């Protein structure tokens, strides 16, 4: 009779579910899990902060289309709260935090990290949260947590594992680890809904498709390409769906949904919008009609019925797996060649997107420092299908978005619908773990404000030999909020938004990473090329101008950047 700990049961169950990495930060509460990982050769990516581990699990899940698992000691629930919020708010990472907690017997004893109801804390920011009350329940509940995380709409779950439950030993023959059995296809759309959607799409004169995170998580690029080729409908995306555009011909790529801002002024407002996993919110101009016209018929496909018509009226709502819906649309259109010729409409879309880009380029001049638009162009020139780009910060990702839709990255990860900065380093760290397995590199493009949240993770990169390239757009400020102060209360009321900082590349070098400081297009391009050539973690500290305001920031505060 062999006796095993609860921690051993956790790891055996995760292995049976296909988990290949664990992200976390050690604590005595979860040492049995760490010991079992050592015995079973499960790599642990141990970060310098629990929040980074939580975001890394998400980045790994999003970049690798796998399950991300984070484990941390009792206090970690407080540190990882934002990571749970980020996932629940729409990034849809497939993640399971496994926090340890004080022993059940120690409740109300004022001992180390005991008596805190982690399940109650996590309930509002997770899909499902539960505390394991008996060691023999671990395999069943771990598998239940995994099914909850992987089922649509995807999101974080939390399984609280008390110290004594993990330390307790039971006969290994007394428990059975169940198999993980999931549907391989997800919920397909009702045939009647599919027919109605295709009928509306056929009649439209200026239809567009807008992709969101659920498309990038669940759809095959080949199916999307087949559907688009058959119907001739140009495709846009929000930030989370951007990577799906990489598989489309240039003539069908409208870019980011923000490009639709100027279409109405050109008498080219879409008359039908097919939203495939895109959700109403900040990325669509809320319900303003600036991007998704009120006059347009909207077909919205999402696995979460709560998202259908959240901020604008829609003509048809379909609750279904987005990837499965795209497959069904591709199959249906492949059997019907009688679709309108939309060559002129696609050409108009391409022209308007190019006009926006040219307008931004023409206004992007800076006498005293490198313009962030020009810095973003340098990044774009070095990005291809072998690179995943992670964007963080406010001004940084807004400037970067103006160029990324013109190239074809292997992946593009951003804040998600929550929109909080500071998540990028952890997300990129996890993405680089997944990308190493796929033979890709990851580049984090972040602001000097946002990188400060996790700057200690350069140590993690060096220890774990992760060749992440961290590009810091350094304007020595919390740029977006500084601009807000200047515009809202006056330039003489700027306070608490300056970051007259030191050497970020020096910090990275002190941890053992490669460090570069650049201040021109030429020096930046050379440094990035060198960093990509070297298979090492690197930091490129890019001195950029503060004054330029990206178009989307002006739109958000009610101004017209193209007036």
Curated annotation (Swiss-Prot):
Cystine pairings recorded for this chain: none
Describe how the cofactor binds: Binds 1 metal ion per subunit.
- Which positions, given as ranges, span the membrane? none
Single GO MF descriptor: magnesium ion binding
Gene3D superfamilies per UniProt: 3.40.50.970, TPP-binding domain
InterPro entries xrefs: DHS-like_NAD/FAD-binding_dom, THDP-binding, Thiamin_PyroP_enz_cen_dom, Thiamin_PyroP_enz_TPP-bd_dom, TPP_enz, TPP_enzyme_TPP-bd
Q: Give Gene Ontology CC terms.
A: acetolactate synthase complex
Cofactor dependence: a metal cation; thiamine diphosphate
Record-stated family: Belongs to the TPP enzyme family.
The protein's name: Benzaldehyde lyase
Taxonomic source organism: Pseudomonas fluorescens
What gene name is listed for this protein?
bznB
